[in-house]
Amino acid sequence: MTLGRLGGDEFALLCEGYGAEKATALALRILDRLNEPFHIGDQELFSSASIGIVLYPYPTDVQNAEQLMRNADSALFKAKSNGRSTYAFYSEELTSQARQRVELVTALRQALEQGQLRLHYQPIYDLRQGTISGFEALVRWQHPEKGLIAPGAFIPIAEETGLISAIDHWVLEQACNQAREWLGQGHPLGFIAVNISSRLFGNGELDLQVATILARSGLEARHLELEITESAVIQDPDAALVLLQRLRALGVQLAIDDFGTGYSSLQRLKRMNVHKLKIDQGFVRGLPDDRDDAAITRSVIGLAHNLGLKVVAEGIETAEQAAFLLAQNCDYGQGYGFARPQPGDAIDWSPSELCHGQACRSSGR
């Protein structure tokens, strides 16, 4: 068995005499060990891995070591696409998928260069008043042939290739410019929320980039909200907490996105010094009838308020969901039940008719 580092965080393991069964068992052992927490000083850190497996002499199209490595890379990409801490075997179908992946990366680079990306904005409502408090900026790809492409089709590949940092920077610039324009038109905008990828957050210079963009756009920092996932923070907790402090010193708002879906740590949450928690739509979807979702939602709202944080619920689609959330004193809500994401010039600033104020409370559970 031979282990070698290919570069960055990628390693290759060559095992002679291994069939599919032994390779699977080895992959599972490696994943189990890497999923265990490890300690550096007094810090508990978590890691994960994805494993791509290729068997030789199958498939027969392998002519050299370079082809074998390309096949292994295709299997690795498949594993990453399936989620964290998993493995995947190479198949001939993956060769076609790898070709499509290369084509997508090339097209995405062109999209950045040729201005094919667009921002749509989803309103975030004050559940008590039914009025718009802010917006979440969501990127779309206006492909010249395929039309409007949703982020789920290209964001994963952007994260994999590193293009996500350039996309994040573009989104920040455009969102700040749009917010400044709305304020100049007299709209009562509280904030514009922008998702920050783990890659951009981890480069350590996010505060400098944000300060530069704010200065160029003329937008006051208090109108910008940065949404950061727990997974971005746990990669280097100490450095993340320092960066969060620097961002807060700029005056921007900070929110933890998809709270409860990753490695949630109450001790870390206490130290983060953020302003909001966002309840993932996976917990909202079952409201108000799913007892587990209801219990989790109540607990998160209570925890956040006890820590002095505001709460945003994502994925609200029905009046019953909005009524339940308001009855639990959830502060803000967004979802298709209120409004779908729209271009900046198509926003309806009218109060929501879905459910708010006394109308919500009278039907709350």
Kindly give the residue locations of the regions a language model identified.
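Short hydrophobic/aromatic beta-strand micro-patches
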Residues: 13-16, 54, 138-140, 195, ...
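Active-site core of bacterial EAL-family cyclic-dinucleotide phosphodiesterase domains
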Residues: 89, 100-157, 195, 256, ...
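C-di-GMP signaling machinery
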Residues: 58, 74, 78-120, 128, ...
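EAL-family c-di-GMP phosphodiesterase catalytic domain
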Residues: 14, 127, 144-145, 197-204, ...
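Structural preference for long, well-ordered alpha-helical segments in enzyme cores
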Residues: 26, 30, 34, 68-75, ...
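Catalytic core of bacterial c-di-GMP phosphodiesterases, primarily the EAL and HD-GYP domains
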Residues: 87, 127-136, 161-239, 315
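Cyclic-dinucleotide signaling modules
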Residues: 1-102, 106
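Flexible loop/coil segments at beta-strand boundaries within sensory signal-transduction domains
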Residues: 41-43, 126-129, 144-146, 185, ...
